[in-house]
Amino acid sequence: MTLQPTFEGRTPEQCLNVHTDSHPDITGCQAALFEWAESYDSKDWDRLKQCIAPFLRIDYRAFLDKLWEKMPAEEFVAMVSHPHFLGNPLLKTQHFVGTMKWEKVDDSKIVGYHQMRVAHQKHLDSQMKEVVAKGHGHGSATVTYRKINGEWKFAGIEPNIRWTEFGGEGIFGPPEKEENGVAADDQVMNSNGSSEVEERNGHVVNKAVEVRSV
């Protein structure tokens, strides 16, 4: 068997540190990954709650310059489901996962390295006929999985954006206009994906959603 190249200083043997008796674990991680991607793209936030760990490591430094070492699950769901983020009903997405490799850290933690393409398409209104913004990211993601009460859960992500299509200006933030024609409020995330945040009483505050810096 040809060994894969070294990844982030790890030897090929370490990157392939999943043996035959670990296949049920990998199947469990794949199931959690599938549920995560499908819950995002279908905007089924109850489904998302079922596949994530109680605490997650969210490393969004690639596009938000923010890192949360231990974000509670309820805060993670609130953040990604916000109408100015993936919860916008006018925003269509697909989180497409390509080939992958696995590293078993211990009996309750596995790290997956996944090729990713994430497509975003934002529409003008609920008719979903006119597209006002597009942005597709290509790269990879490092995903952490943890075994909770015998079941593997999605427990963190670190995207690595290699290149993008269409720029993505205007993807995140409020709709171009409200259904009644009234202009929406100021955009929360700019074209680079960085958010307007401030530090207040030891908390990182986003005008779209408050998440605790831990």
UniProtKB/Swiss-Prot annotation:
Molecular function as annotated in GO: lyase activity
One Pfam assignment: Scytalone_dh
UniProt entry tagged with the keyword Lyase: yes
SUPFAM superfamilies linked: NTF2-like
Free-text function comment from the UniProt entry: Scytalone dehydratase-like protein; part of the gene cluster that mediates the biosynthesis of monodictyphenone, a prenyl xanthone derivative. The pathway begins with the synthesis of atrochrysone thioester by the polyketide synthase (PKS) mdpG. The atrochrysone carboxyl ACP thioesterase mdpF then breaks the thioester bond and releases the atrochrysone carboxylic acid from mdpG. The atrochrysone carboxylic acid is then converted to atrochrysone which is further transformed into emodin anthrone.
Family: Belongs to the scytalone dehydratase family.
Name of the protein: Scytalone dehydratase-like protein mdpB
Organism in which the protein naturally occurs: Emericella nidulans (strain FGSC A4 / ATCC 38163 / CBS 112.46 / NRRL 194 / M139)
